[in-house]
């Protein structure tokens, strides 16, 4: 089995092949995201702690977190699921994935070093690969350089040198995201003002509608009362005429 080991602190990654079954036994029956001591791999790994981050079986199917089995299953996957990238909007597909429990049928196991041991591993912990790009978000730049809210973040942007033959050397900087500028604050104030105007307008319209509704209801009530009074007058008139006719007979 091959072990793909990465060390985030230095940015290095190394693929080693282990043939001894006894060394690999410590990773069997362990689920993804489990932290395991790497001491059985050899004396140079003494004190190291690694986390199982994934792997592939001998047919190339990836391990999927949450699938509690050794074998393969076919799952209906959509956007946002691991082990699947949709080609069209809303597309879903049934894909074969391997369970998250490790065993001898894996061809590659991915490990992440979470605790460094006593000795350095050549090509993994003894060298550092610099990051190509710096942070882009304003809060992350502040965190990197330990800046206060009052400090100007734009002066601390990590610039990337661009060199071309026969041209002046120049640098390129990312556009800072979530940067609080006077323009942003002005837009925020405008949004709040527009929201207040909308609420005020809605209140006024609601009060006008309530007044109009009350007026219409009052008019309807008066009309209904007039109709009732008219009916009563007519009924009393009929009653009086019928009495006079009966008395004449």
UniProtKB/Swiss-Prot annotation:
Residues 216-249 are annotated as: Disordered. Residues 216-229 have a biased composition (Basic and acidic residues). PROSITE patterns: RIBOSOMAL_S6E (PS00578). It is found in: Cytoplasm. The modification Phosphoserine is found at residues 235-236, 240, 244, 247. The keyword Nuclease does not apply. Signal peptide: none annotated. It holds the Pfam family Ribosomal_S6e. Component of the small ribosomal subunit. This is Small ribosomal subunit protein eS6. It comes from Oncorhynchus mykiss.
């Amino acid at each position: 089995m091959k072990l793909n080991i990465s060390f985030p602190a230095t940015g290095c990654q190394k693929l080693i092949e282990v043939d001894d079954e006894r060394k690999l036994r410590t990773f069997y029956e362990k689920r993804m995201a489990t932290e395991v001591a790497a001491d059985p791999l050899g004396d140079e790994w003494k004190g190291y702690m690694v986390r199982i981050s994934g792997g592939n079986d001998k047919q190339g199917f990836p391990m999927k977190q949450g699938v509690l089995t050794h074998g393969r299953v076919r799952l209906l996957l959509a956007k946002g699921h691991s082990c699947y990238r949709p080609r069209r909007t809303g597309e879903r597909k049934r894909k074969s994935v391997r369970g998250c429990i490790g065993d001898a049928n894996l061809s590659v196991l991915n490990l992440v070093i979470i605790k460094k041991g006593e000795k350095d591993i050549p090509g993994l912990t003894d060298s550092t690969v610099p990051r190509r790009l710096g942070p882009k978000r304003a809060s992350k730049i502040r965190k990197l350089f330990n800046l206060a809210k009052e400090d100007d973040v734009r002066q601390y942007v990590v610039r990337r040198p661009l060199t071309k033959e026969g041209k002046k050397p120049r640098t390129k900087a990312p556009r800072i995201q979530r940067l609080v500028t006077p323009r942003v604050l002005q837009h925020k104030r405008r949004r709040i003002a527009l929201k207040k105007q909308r609420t005020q307008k809605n209140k006024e319209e609601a009060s006008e509608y309530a007044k109009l509704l009350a007026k219409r209801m009052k008019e309807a009530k008066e009309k209904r009362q007039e109709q009732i009074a008219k009916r009563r007058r007519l009924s009393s008139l009929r009653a009086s005429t019928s009495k006079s006719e009966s008395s004449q007979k």
